[in-house]
């Protein structure tokens, strides 16, 4: 008889979990990263890159296409012109121990951008998006710290580009 009770309890948990998923899905709740139905609606976007970062330009292009927009090199075809004015990453000490040894660092990534219609009308004045992470000083010295910074910088760049796409999607 106890085995039957465990099976029944397990079945009730599965049923409860399924009902919760159905209710949350029905009210529009989505996991982080879902587009939620908002898109760039096929807008043709030209990117003017003043940062010189190939990785950033690639990430922005992929995000535009992944958000329902289209990327173009030709300014004459574009609906919007997205200008990437600059990007910067910086590191600072976040915490130290009693002896003054660094325990944690804070890495920050900032992207300056603006958006205009192809005719020149400004849609978004120049502004900045920022993302940051705190990370423990890794064992292994400067090489390990640089490797960890590079890994986090890529994550922060992706986060800032995601925020940029969310901002652009609100303008359609």
Language model regions located:
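Sec/Tat-exported extracytoplasmic proteins
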Residues: 64-68, 115-119, 163-172
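Short coil/turn motifs at beta-sheet boundaries
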Residues: 38-40, 75-77, 100-106
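Bacterial Sec signal peptide processing site at the extreme N-terminus
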Residues: 21-42
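C-terminal/domain-edge helix-coil "capping" segments
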Residues: 143-172
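N-terminal secretory signal peptides and thylakoid transit peptides that target proteins
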Residues: 1-19
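N-terminal segment of the mature soluble domain
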Residues: 40-88
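Surface-exposed short loop/turn segments
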Residues: 83-128, 134-147
């Amino acid at each position: 008889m106890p085995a039957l009770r465990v099976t029944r309890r397990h079945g009730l948990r599965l049923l409860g979990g399924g009902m919760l998923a159905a209710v949350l899905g029905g009210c529009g709740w989505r996991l982080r990263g879902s587009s939620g139905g908002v898109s760039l609606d096929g807008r043709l976007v030209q990117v003017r890159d003043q940062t010189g970062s190939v990785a950033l330009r690639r990430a922005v292009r992929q995000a535009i296409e992944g958000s329902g927009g289209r990327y173009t090199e030709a300014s004459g075809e574009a609906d919007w012109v997205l200008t990437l004015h600059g990007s910067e990453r910086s590191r600072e000490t976040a915490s130290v121990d009693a002896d003054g040894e660094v325990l944690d660092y804070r890495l920050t990534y900032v992207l300056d951008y603006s958006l205009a219609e192809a005719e020149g009308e400004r849609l978004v004045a120049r502004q900045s998006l920022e993302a940051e992470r705190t990370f423990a000083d890794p064992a292994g010295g400067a090489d390990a710290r640089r490797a960890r910074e590079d890994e986090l910088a890529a994550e922060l760049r992706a986060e800032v580009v995601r925020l940029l796409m969310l901002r652009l999607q609100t303008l359609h």
